[in-house]
């Protein structure tokens, strides 16, 4: 696992592990150590180990933004659990700059019946293609890529990229 630079700044690999724990009513009820670099990939195996070894399934999962991923949300939903995971962009999404950024898809109107967005200039962003990405855990994430039908003579074009 690569860790922060040491005083020599030589960036060498150092032995390290990712420690995860569960707290229930102020007591640590489960602990695991994993070699994975990020918390995202430790989440599902961690929950499975808890259920397998303790014969108990937590119905409400509370975590921080380090665990936020489509794969983790899908797992929680498939297992009839409820997630309280803080979105990774939560703090920045509250800023004025974020809310006024017209290039963000979050700040456009979405029409589900037509599967399209309307930009600041009133133009349609239509679904152009589907991108499928497979994670190292094997989970397939499907993303729809949208393009503007006509960006010619758009006053907002420069701020959209």
How should each PLM-predicted stretch be described?
Residues 1-161:
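Anion-binding and metal-coordination hotspots
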